[in-house]
Regions:
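Gly/Pro-rich hinge or "lid" segments in bacterial periplasmic/extracellular proteins
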Residues: 61, 79, 175-244, 248, ...
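Structural transition elements
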Residues: 340-385, 407-412
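Detector for C-terminal structural segments
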Residues: 323-356, 410-420, 444-558
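N-terminal lobe/hinge region of extracytoplasmic solute-binding protein
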Residues: 45-98, 214
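Ligand-site clamp/hinge motif
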Residues: 202, 237-282
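Surface-exposed binding/hinge segments that line
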Residues: 122-124, 139-197
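Aromatic- and charge-enriched surface segment that lines or borders ligand/interaction sites
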Residues: 92-142, 172, 266, 310-312
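Ligand/substrate-recognition segments at binding pockets and active sites
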Residues: 226, 375, 380-458, 528
Length: 558
């Protein structure tokens, strides 16, 4: 599972990480009234504890949200005048051959948190470690285009992977085929560096605590009190330290969103995100608060364990997909501030200059139109599936549990809504399982569930990012589903240089996913209702920016 957004994710995670920045708005450290400079700091929160700082093993957005600030990638996705642009990270310049299959990255002068220089070999080691089947990297599918990747997965030497250190400051990456979005892929956590000596020194402890991790980014992980708080401190050894204005970041880990709301009101947080109607109105009325609403590249969705005795059946999965009234759910649970999903690929994604969702159309509407044309309801498909499985014709005999990754009041209210929804549409008595993120994630990875509900945030602006999650070799979303035709279409699309052909290949793949196999149930394209104290500047407004806290300022704090 994934960022970053990754890997990976409870519904409310879309409102928990503040973060990415743009390249403008830095005001510096402002002097107080007496003329003395005041160090800038930022107080924020997330709703679950990160699982690890090991970039080869993280999959959830909580972990990747922190890693994005303590690590530096080859390049980052920035914002300039409201548009995406690739900006330097460890690599200050880069170029490719004419075919787009050999990329050369020229590293600048950056250091690790122990003072040693970041080298091209650190990237070689990191990519090899993530590609190694023994590591179990949940995001290794981002390495699929790299030459030798398939051979390594089949047991070949790690040296087979197409990554090479020409010298300490020059990294060469060879691809099996040209990938139009390769630089965007390089912004992801799997392309971050790792120091071999540190990984080997700490073994299984690597990434589990601040002292068992090394950093090359704008911040260091100063403290990590699990399930309580994380403290980040500006790192002077960072290559772009002069541009980092906020000295200290405190990330409170709050299991209950209502605690965040009261902390914001008390001045203990500089940011809060919410979809709760009463709190939105309260925060909108505050004179000390700026409101930012963005439609992200995220999707909230239900998904099925296709190895389950019941949900192995496509008609039963279709019944559950059709039973959800997305517009009603949006109004009841989000106050109408999100958008009903129209596909798996969000409306924020494009292929070149063409918005993918506009090209592919509303596949959820197409599902209902097909059912209407055939005179079928959601319950009809459920009964058809039950007949195919020899389960009789009484939905109340079905034993079904819906798993949610949260235990607070919002999740319990949402669980009640789901029970009513599925009882009305399908006539079933649905059970709800509530658990904290760590337990929920563990159950998914072991296949110990029937239906789950999560949110997923795309790393970069190409449909491959989210469609590849369902490829056979990818266990990011543990559905157990495999389809050779789907795999072939997604792979062909990734390397297709003609935009029109690429669009059509992605559409065909998404059609299999949503209109033939019903493996996943896209429910909402959520908006982010973000509230910042008005002295906070430099936060991002675009979905795929990866700047982190380094471009933010709080210099106007009184």
């Amino acid at each position: 599972m994934k960022k970053a957004l990754s890997i990976i994710l409870a519904l409310v995670m879309l409102l928990t990480l503040v973060g990415c920045s743009n390249e403008s708005g830095n005001e510096g450290t402002k002097p107080a009234e007496g003329g003395e400079a005041v160090a800038q700091y930022y107080n924020t929160y997330m709703t679950a504890d990160p699982t690890s700082m090991d970039i080869s093993r993280i999959s959830d957005s909580y972990s990747s949200g922190i890693v994005n600030n303590v690590m530096e990638s080859l390049v980052r996705m920035g914002e300039v005048d409201g548009n995406y642009v690739i900006i330097p990270g460890d690599a200050q310049t880069w170029e490719s051959n004419a075919e787009g299959t050999v990329w050369t990255f020229h590293l600048g002068d950056n250091t690790w948190s122990d003072g040693q220089p970041v080298t091209a070999q650190d990237y070689v080691y990191s990519l090899r470690r993530s590609a190694d089947p023994a590591t179990g990297c949940p995001n290794e599918y981002f390495l699929l285009p790299v030459a030798g990747y398939n051979e390594v997965r089949d047991g070949a030497s790690l040296e087979t992977l197409g990554v090479k250190a020409i010298d300490d400051k020059t990294l060469e990456v060879t691809l099996s085929y040209p990938v139009p979005s390769f630089l965007e892929m390089c912004c992801g956590t799997v392309y971050y560096p790792q120091r071999q000596d540190i990984v080997e020194q700490y073994g299984e402890q690597y990434g589990s605590e601040p002292q068992y991790t090394l950093y090359n980014g704008p911040y260091s992980l100063e403290s990590w009190v699990h399930n309580s708080s994380i403290t980040l401190k500006k790192r002077e050894g960072y290559w772009n330290a002069d541009a980092v204005q906020i000295e200290n970041v405190t990330v409170n880990i709050l299991g209950d969103s209502s605690t965040a709301y009261t902390m914001y009101e008390a001045g203990q947080l500089d940011y809060v995100g919410t979809s709760a109607a009463e709190w939105v109105q309260k925060f909108l009325a505050r004179e000390d608060t700026d409101y930012v609403k963005t439609f992200s590249a995220n999707v909230n969705y239900a998904f099925y364990n296709t190895k389950d005795a019941l949900f192995q059946n496509a008609n039963i999965r279709r019944a559950f997909n059709m039973a959800v009234d997305r517009a009603d759910l949006n109004e009841v649970t989000f106050g109408g501030r999100s958008n009903p999903a129209t596909g798996w690929v969000t409306s924020a994604m494009a292929v070149g200059s063409t918005n993918y969702r506009e090209y592919a159309g509303d596949m959820i509407a197409a599902m209902y139109a097909d059912a209407e044309a055939n005179g079928m309801t959601a319950k009809d498909y459920l009964l058809k599936g039950m007949e195919e499985l020899g389960l009789g014709n009484d939905p109340k005999t079905l034993d079904i549990t819906f798993s949610l990754a949260g235990t607070d009041e919002w999740f319990r209210t949402y669980g009640e809504y789901l029970q009513q929804t599925y009882n009305t549409a399908l006539g079933i008595d649905l059970k709800i399982s509530f658990s904290e993120w760590g337990i929920f994630s563990s159950n998914l990875s072991t296949g110990n569930y029937q239906i789950g509900y999560m949110g997923w945030g795309a790393y970069y602006n190409d449909p491959y990012d989210v469609l590849s999650l369902f490829m056979t070799e990818n266990d990011a979303i543990s559905t157990g589903w495999s389809n050779a035709e789907f795999d072939a279409l997604v792979l062909a699309a990734q390397s297709e240089m003609d935009e029109a052909k690429r669009l059509e290949l992605y559409k065909q793949a998404e059609t299999i996913l949503l209109l033939e196999e019903y493996v996943v149930n896209p429910i909402l394209f959520p908006s982010s209702n973000s509230f910042y104290k008005n002295y906070v500047q430099g936060y991002v407004t675009l979905a795929f920016s990866s700047g982190g806290y380094q471009g933010m300022t709080t210099g106007g704090r009184q």
